[in-house]
Amino acid sequence: MTKTNKIIGIDLGTTNSCVAVMEGGEAKVIPNAEGGRTTPSVVSFKGDEIMVGEIAKRQVITNPNTISSIKRHMGEANYTVNVGGKKYTPQEISAMILANLKKTAEDYLGAQVSEAVITVPAYFNDAQRQATKDAGKIAGLNVKRIINEPTAAALSYGVDKGDKEQTILVFDLGGGTFDVSILTLVDGTFEVLSTSGDNALGGDDFDLRIVDFLVQEFKKENSVDLSKDKMAMQRLKDAAEKAKKELSGVTSSQISLPFLTMSEAGPLHLEYNMTRAKFNELTKDLIDRCLAPVKRALGDAKLDIEKIDQVLLVGGSTRIPAVQDLVKNELKKTPNKSINPDEVVGIGAAIQGGILSGDVKDILTLLDVTPLSLGIETLGNVFTKLIERNSTIPTSEKQVFSTAADNLPAVDIHVLQGERPLAADNKTLGRFQLTDRPPHRAEFLKLKITFDLDANGIVSVKAKDLGTNKEQKITISGSGALKEEEIQRMIREAEENAEVDRVKKESIDARNEAENMIFHTKKSLEDLKADVTPEEKDKVETQIKELEEALKGDDTALIKEKTASLTKESQGIAMKAYQKAQEKQAQEKGTQENTTAKNEKPQDEVVDADFEEKK
């Protein structure tokens, strides 16, 4: 089979997946072998046979070796599923789905496919994105780009809408997750302003409400618990999903399941006329749950509802009339439904693939954002942010730090993700060390920390000793998995604990400043003992003792007061230290000039020199 240079687009969904490709200047969804334009994200094992898609979905309840919704566990370092004594990671199960989609594309194109763009939820963190790339690699795909699902959706709409300036809200209610993103389209550039969502809300939950209701009704009428009958539950689940879909177009759906189970008296049948009103009643709380992420996304973007120009519906569950009514009533906009919501993300991924391969010339730029802040732990358990939450990616930030103590042989770099001021309250992404360092005084050691966040949302952290130019680097992967619930919990806790955190951080900063002042003052007293009068020394040492005593307590105001007193009292000593340093520098310069004159080199010979990088 010949190899194609086309880059396919894949929407790897929790419940269903979709593959598309650019052909003749437009994105086309590729039907699978059964003719379906989407493929269930389900894998089933039967002996040595591995089944993917619709055939696997039909065995979800009856075959215990059937895996569904594996996407919920992407990025979880220790999560595996056990099938016949063999353990599979989420990446391996996802790779089986991706391999199936890859084959679908190859059968359609008649050529070997090796490159893809894969979409992920906007809230996916570094570990989850890396796991998705790994799954692609296992499936034999070089993942050229990971893009956010709402961005892909906006891209698919945006190709037809031109570059008119607008603010877009993407309402993505899929089979297993719910995401809200707000984007702007200006001069052909999409920029994500904010993202929010609920990782435990989707079409599956709506199906389950119908199933649970029918189980209860059947038990009332027949005194038989269907939940203990796997075959009956499989039929119920299929019937519930069918009824839900029908109720999007009609006001009632007849659920008819003859010979559903057996009793002592003989076979039992289920007949129920599910109305849209009853369905709305059963799922009202699920509809209401859609509101909070919408409000949070608007708040994060600092926008009023009136500023939203367009609402895009993504995900099959947005066909539910009550969902569309919620959007109309709360956002005061008639949602855009011009593209099939099951296919819109896959189409956007294919367009991005076309941009990368050169098939699409009218390029729309994508500017995604990172869902949480990134940084490191600094003295006193403080979380120092280098990349702020909702920063546009790709991005790179660097900052120079000094160490807290002299002669450290190694420096531990603790990489974190979150929104709280204290390191312990945030999520650890990884740790690494800068080792084998020569003895240095703390004030002379400078470390440059660089964070690089690539277009896929994957972070690399580099530490460089500016004295020795020694570097150490880490690319964060699997161990730092965050679920959407964790992200939303972190954001919520950051808001709820803002004042408590401010007080804690103020206390830590005051202590750090005090300890730093004591250290440098004692050092100056030692270095300048020949130049400091006994009276000056006594006054400064008294202030040091008072500050050290204050540090034993928790009175931040007192610590600040005593630090200020010590600073004022030691100003004379500090001035002497500065003058002495200036004199020493002048002497060294004179000696150097004298040596240079004696050993003058030809003009064209290179001479090493120190330099200071200006920022």
Curated annotation (Swiss-Prot):
**Keyword Transmembrane helix in record:** no
From the UniProt record, list the coiled-coil ranges: none
| Positions of region (Disordered) | 567-615
Describe what upregulates or represses it: By stress conditions e.g. heat shock.
Q: Which residues carry this modification: Phosphothreonine?
A: 177
Q: Which UniProt keywords apply?
A: ATP-binding, Chaperone, Nucleotide-binding, Phosphoprotein, Stress response
A Pfam family matched by this chain, by name? HSP70
Offer an example of a GO molecular function term for this protein.
Answer: ATP-dependent protein folding chaperone
Where are the compositionally biased (Acidic residues) regions? 605-615
Record protein name field = Chaperone protein DnaK
User: Which family is it part of?
Assistant: Belongs to the heat shock protein 70 family.
Biased composition range(s): Basic and acidic residues: 581-591
Q: What does this protein do?
A: Acts as a chaperone.
